[in-house]
């Protein structure tokens, strides 16, 4: 007689994709294990946008793209897949939309309401569960507090959430911000200062039951990224993820012009610049395959032809 699995087909697909042996996911430590496994596999990347191959999104499309076809994605893809995974394990979880602060100037907001975040309610406390904020990854749930007194540490830095007043982005008045800073071992002093990552309201829940791919929040956020006047994510290819060489963690970052490894502990960088001709596209694709385990781009984005 064939054994009856206690896991759904989607749960088994997700476990396989993140390279994790199936097990019940019941505690915050279990969620942390899943978040770490996600960071080992999922790349934060915008390749479908820069190659003009986007399609309307719902759960089935996301499974096809990220789980079956081994793609990565931005927050609206990866965090949504984690949402469905944890929801099937019975977690009280919902998705919200927040606004990311410009991580270079820290003076304005990038794409208001353009960041999709998971919030879980565990034992009557709220936590941020985000596996797709670039490589600023806490790798475990972050408690939502009033004063930011509970700090979570990962290989990428320190994270906290605190309550704020008069934090306005677009038409929204947010109630909380996520802040992050680098580890004490970081060699660049400015990196050890707390900065805002993004602002949000943990109770501003979006409807995630809509399966009409043309009108889902995932499709709407994707269109916000495409239409963003700064074109930060729509014209410049980017892939980034945490890599572990067995002794230390680094952040791998691939752009049209270069590949960079940044040591998470010290901030020291090793950078390889690509040739300034059409062979840079070939070098880009080689790194996509060898470092990020992503399928190569089939069409050349305009940035490589300039």
Swiss-Prot record:
Q: Which reaction does it catalyse?
A: an arylamine + acetyl-CoA = an N-acetylarylamine + CoA
EC number in record: 2.3.1.5
Keyword check for Acyltransferase, yes or no.
yes
Keywords, comma-separated and alphabetical: Acyltransferase, Transferase
Domain of life per record: Eukaryota
What terms describe the molecular function in GO for this protein? Answer: arylamine N-acetyltransferase activity
InterPro entries tied to this protein: Arylamine_N-AcTrfase, Arylamine_NAT_domain_sf, Papain-like_cys_pep_sf
Please give the family membership noted in the entry: Belongs to the arylamine N-acetyltransferase family.
| Protein name in the entry | Probable arylamine N-acetyltransferase 3
Species of origin: Dictyostelium discoideum
